[in-house]
């Protein structure tokens, strides 16, 4: 569960984007819709602990996201819309980064690749984001 309590934040001190907002997001799949520039990405960054609210707090499963604790980070991963992808293979990338996720299962990883018809030897930079 994601819980946002009384968050205020803005890029300029005299112009808040969010002013004392609160909401709870339960388990499930959600979409975040809004006009260009209204703060969708900023909200996601606040939830992930990549930005720090002026006031209030964001919690994911009762862990304050700003603290970026290992018990929180080992269960969640934020994949930005645009990012530089490494030129190593999918298998190499998984081998290098799976050590940061104690619950990573090589077996599940292999099953997911198979279900999605993705070749693990393929360079990560060539895989579709879709």
Pin down the residues of each PLM region.
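Conserved A-loop
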Residues: 8-13, 25, 60, 101
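Short beta-strand immediately N-terminal to the Walker A/P-loop
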Residues: 30-32
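Helix-to-loop junction immediately C-terminal to a conserved catalytic motif
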Residues: 48
């Amino acid at each position: 569960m994601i819980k946002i309590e009384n968050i205020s934040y803005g890029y300029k001190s005299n112009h808040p984007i969010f002013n004392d907002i609160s909401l709870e997001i339960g388990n499930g799949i959600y979409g975040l819709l809004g006009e260009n520039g209204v703060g969708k990405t900023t909200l996601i960054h606040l939830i992930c602990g990549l930005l720090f609210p002026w006031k209030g707090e964001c919690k994911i499963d009762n862990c304050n996201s700003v603290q970026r604790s290992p018990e929180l980070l080992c269960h969640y991963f934020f994949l930005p819309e645009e990012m530089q992808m490494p030129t190593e293979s999918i298998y190499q990338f998984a081998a290098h980064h799976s050590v940061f996720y104690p619950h990573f299962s090589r077996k599940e990883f292999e099953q997911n690749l198979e279900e999605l018809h993705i070749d693990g030897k393929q360079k990560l930079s060539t895989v579709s984001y879709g």
